[in-house]
């Protein structure tokens, strides 16, 4: 691609720098750059097919972000010990990049395009997701691919009341706002993040702060593109791929019919779809009779554009929506808990034609999710999985496991709920939430938030506050600035509209949000209006949820694992575990419990999980017996563990053995101890002495027996 290396630098506060370099790596790609901040380096490449597939009427764009384990000096886990398919974390970053760049390709560009972003060097303090969007955009800018960028994405966090761009990993842990913001020099395109119940004005301030950093990064990309000066590929002009005469005929013939149908306010989406489809079918039949060569591909496209225009005009001119609602009206809500009697927690949440059946399952520390990534190793005690079967929209599709959409929706709902979970010290359980979407007509991820909140309270998890979510939409005339903000959008409004803005939070504030914008001109004032309207909708939904349950249940379900905790001296941990774990494994096997032993702040913390309280209490008793301190002079029932010529070793307390000397077995002289005691025999013994140096125990049996000499006397 290039014969020389070109590099540009972006300056950040606190003497930090980002460099963008091209001309050294992957020169056969249509565009490639290396973005570096500290020791974190990303290689981004773009390639495209110049041959156009005439059957494709969309942009076949593929964005893949992958972390190389070697970047962090690690070898991947698993049997193959190599990178495989993208993990959830990589999918989420791929989606962040895709959502920001996809709107900026020209309408007439429909060539297959692939963007790969590799993490090739990893500084654990500098997070690569903050640089992935910048890398992808820079690679596009220096490539022949027509791209109406540049864009960039930055991470903005509020730490101790101050906003920081691309904070370090350690600093991020103290943030109360954590946002990824993507945009161009003029517009914000994408927002996603989590926060600690903050106010709407705080979100707007964070976005505006991020946009200033984005503008600078876009300017540097322009300088890089000017220095490379790649000749851009020209896609086929729209005039050569469009039939404007057919479009005009379709609009003139059908606009009034479609508008009248839309204004009926049909609430059932299948009936509404059928009504629009009938209009389309009848007119297409008429067109084909007049001209059998009429392009059905073009007609389908123009009819879709007609529907889109009608929806916009209906909302902008009359303040009405497809299902008859007003702009800020929320669909009818129904919810119930304890729907599944055998689950640890469950809820059924229905809003209009969107329905989520959600379960909560409580597990032990052994059920924690293993996280094995290039930059992060550890365990997660909170999981949320979102499932979207095809029948939820009345379609036939093969179930091939969770796709990118399911992973993204589940992650957003998880972020919304995790902010209200009790601290680890207050919650002993690993928590898994599963949301199965049974019906879908818009905002199923926010239905998952609502259902998840209800199910957690049903399960007895002491969340700080209930959480609700709402999806907002926007219809906007970019020429006049006239707009309509929609609350609780339908699936059609999402597809036909200009914005999808999901907001989740408590009565106190916002805990998560996600926004995708398709138009320019979204001013701070308009964003503020959308957030305030979203707040009113969220509070309304919370009110409906409170009719079902207002506080978490005070007890766990009978099917949930029973739990208790115990503190023991640090020096007794080994006694409870036993040689090679023998004692604790035996306890778990015989009581049917799971026992977790940890050292915390110089103490032993033992957690017991069992199928019922009786099992837990049984395990507790056995541990108490092990850690109990023997008392000199007390009598115990001991088991003969071994017999030696000079006596026997007797276990008089769990894990504690003492010597019963041959002279302490009987008052009479014993020649052969095997004739008096048997292995496994249970005998009463008295603790005579604990050696102050060795801690060894001295036992006696004879002192509990009558003394023949005393009897004779």
Curated annotation (Swiss-Prot):
Coiled coil: none annotated. It catalyses: RNA(n+1) + phosphate = RNA(n) + a ribonucleoside 5'-diphosphate. GO terms for cellular component: cytosol. It is found in: Cytoplasm. Keywords: Cytoplasm, Magnesium, Metal-binding, Nucleotidyltransferase, RNA-binding, Transferase. Its cofactor is Mg(2+). SMART domains: KH (SM00322), S1 (SM00316). InterPro entries: ExoRNase_PH_dom1 (IPR001247), ExoRNase_PH_dom2 (IPR015847), ExoRNase_PH_dom2_sf (IPR036345), KH_dom (IPR004087), KH_dom_type_1 (IPR004088), KH_dom_type_1_sf (IPR036612), NA-bd_OB-fold (IPR012340), PNPase (IPR012162). GO terms for biological process: mRNA catabolic process; RNA processing. Involved in mRNA degradation. Catalyzes the phosphorolysis of single-stranded polyribonucleotides processively in the 3'- to 5'-direction. Belongs to the polyribonucleotide nucleotidyltransferase family. This is Polyribonucleotide nucleotidyltransferase. It comes from Amoebophilus asiaticus (strain 5a2). The gene is pnp.
